[in-house]
Amino acid sequence: GKLMSERTLPPEALDEWAAALRERFNLGPDDLPIALILDLARVVAVGVARPTAPFSAFAAGLVAGRSGGSPEQVREALASITELAASWPDRSESA
């Protein structure tokens, strides 16, 4: 199959994928806050660098899981990393 980066993802496919993840891993609707995850990815990609978005999302999940994994802890981890990326200084000039 094609790599994900070679495909475009219509909004309904995003919902379908999220539903599949929720079912596979027995997650509730609040366990996978799509809008906050996408915000994190966008802010990190723009504020830090595009390649840092996937592992920043992974880090948010890891932090949330180690903190107990409640929906509130998921939101807190996402918000913390999003805030860090939003305040990240532009390092493109310092070479």
What residue spans do the PLM features occupy?
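Long, acidic, intrinsically disordered low-complexity segments
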Residues: G1-F25
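S-adenosylmethionine-dependent methyltransferases
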Residues: E16, E23, L27, D39, ...
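Amphipathic, hydrophobic secondary-structure cores in small proteins
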Residues: P29, I34-S67
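C-terminal binding/interaction regions
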Residues: S5-R7, L21-R22, G69-A95
